[in-house]
Amino acid sequence: MIEIKDNFLDKEDFDKIKEVYNSPNIPWAMGDILYDDEINSEVSILDNLQFINPVYSMNQPVSQLFEYWIPLLKKTKAVALYSIKINLNPRTPKIYEHGLHTDTGFMCKTGVFYINSNDGYTSFEDGTKVESVENRFVSFNSDMKHSGTSCTNQKYRLVMNINYFEAKFINLPHK
C-alpha cells in the first residue's frame, strides 16, 4: 500500500531542512541514478546522473546533517534504519522516468520525502504517480517497484530517500 502524507513536518522543521539543502555548502557526491541495465531505455546513459548526500548508512549517521532528519524519523513508525540519502536530480529539457527498481533486496519500508515542489514525480509499477510536492512523505513496502524522475520547471528535483524497519518487519511488539 502507498501512503501519502502532506505537510508531514511542522513548518519550522521543514524550513530548516529546506534552507540547509538549498545552500551551496552541501557536500554532494556525483553518482549514477540506477545501474545502466536498470535505466529506462528512453534515458541516455549520459543522463544517468544525480548528486547524492548520504546521511545514514552502515548502521550509523554518516553526515552531521543527520540531526535535521530526527523530526521526520519521529513521525514514521521506524524502529531501525537501513539508509537515508538525499538525491538531487538536475533539470532536464523533458521529464525522464529513470526506471523501475527497488531500493533493497529485503522487506522493509521505503519512504520518499519531497524537499522541493516541481513537475517531477515518483511512479510505481501499478501506474500510480505521486507528484513532487514539498513537505510530502510517501511510504510503501520496499518490494514495490518505483521510479523517480527529473523535472523541467525547477533547477533540480530534491528528495530524501529512506529505507527503514517498522516493528512488524522485525517481530517486535507493536505499541
For each predicted feature, which ranges?
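A short glycine-rich, His/Asp/Glu-containing loop-to-beta-strand
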Residues: 74-93
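Short beta-strand His + acidic residue motifs that chelate non-heme Fe in jelly-roll/DSBH
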Residues: 99-100, 145-153
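A short beta-strand-loop-beta hairpin characteristic of the jelly-roll/cupin
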Residues: 94-99, 106, 114-133
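A short hydrophobic beta-strand segment most commonly corresponding to one strand
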Residues: 111-113, 154-170
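Conserved metal-binding segment of the jelly-roll/cupin
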Residues: 91, 130-147
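Non-heme Fe(II)/2-oxoglutarate
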Residues: 1-79
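Double-stranded beta-helix
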Residues: 3, 123, 162-175
